[in-house]
């Protein structure tokens, strides 16, 4: 049986699928065009940094946590917080662009459509320009973080590797910095 790929991966490879899903989300009012809102953009960017700061704090203070609760790790929550930091940064960008997305997947779809879909070749996507492009790798970062967040949130296991938590945190830091740079333009 063929393993089903996440939608965001399909969108990166197939612009027709991206366009169809984007239009379907709009028709269902999951994605709505709204007036651009810099105040809402700022609120979500502040929340992104808030979540990222606490995720960093949790990793840095793991030894202190272990003094209180022996051998307990919270790397699952680091992954969750790092993903939500990325999600709020994505929402900040959407509010600036004049979009509201009702689901996490619709948020990623809108990012792909509005920020990634402006170029003809994948190689061209690597640069940020005045048309607010995100690279394919940055879309992958939030997509992978979403998958990790789902595993960390819904898995019965509490043991997640420090390396996976730190990788998600690093992805979140890069993604949020990129969004912050875009919002400052």
Model-derived regions, located:
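Terminal alpha-helical segments
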Residues: 1-185
């Amino acid at each position: 049986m063929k393993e089903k790929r996440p939608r965001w991966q399909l969108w990166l490879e197939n612009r027709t699928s991206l366009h169809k899903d984007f239009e379907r989300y709009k028709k269902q009012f999951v994605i709505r065009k709204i007036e651009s809102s810099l105040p809402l953009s700022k609120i979500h960017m502040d929340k992104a940094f808030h979540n990222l700061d606490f995720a960093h704090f949790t990793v840095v203070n793991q030894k202190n946590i272990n003094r209180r609760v022996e051998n307990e790790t919270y790397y699952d929550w680091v992954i969750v917080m790092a993903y939500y930091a990325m999600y709020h940064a994505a929402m900040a960008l959407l509010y600036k662009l004049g979009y509201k997305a009702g689901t996490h997947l619709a948020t990623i779809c809108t990012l792909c459509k509005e920020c990634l879909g402006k170029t003809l070749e994948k190689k061209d996507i690597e640069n940020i320009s005045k048309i607010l492009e995100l690279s394919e790798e940055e879309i992958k970062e939030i997509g992978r973080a979403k998958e990790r967040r789902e595993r960390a949130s819904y898995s019965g296991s509490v043991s997640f590797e420090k390396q996976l938590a730190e990788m998600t945190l690093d992805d979140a830091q890069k993604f949020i910095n990129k969004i912050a740079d875009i919002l400052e333009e």
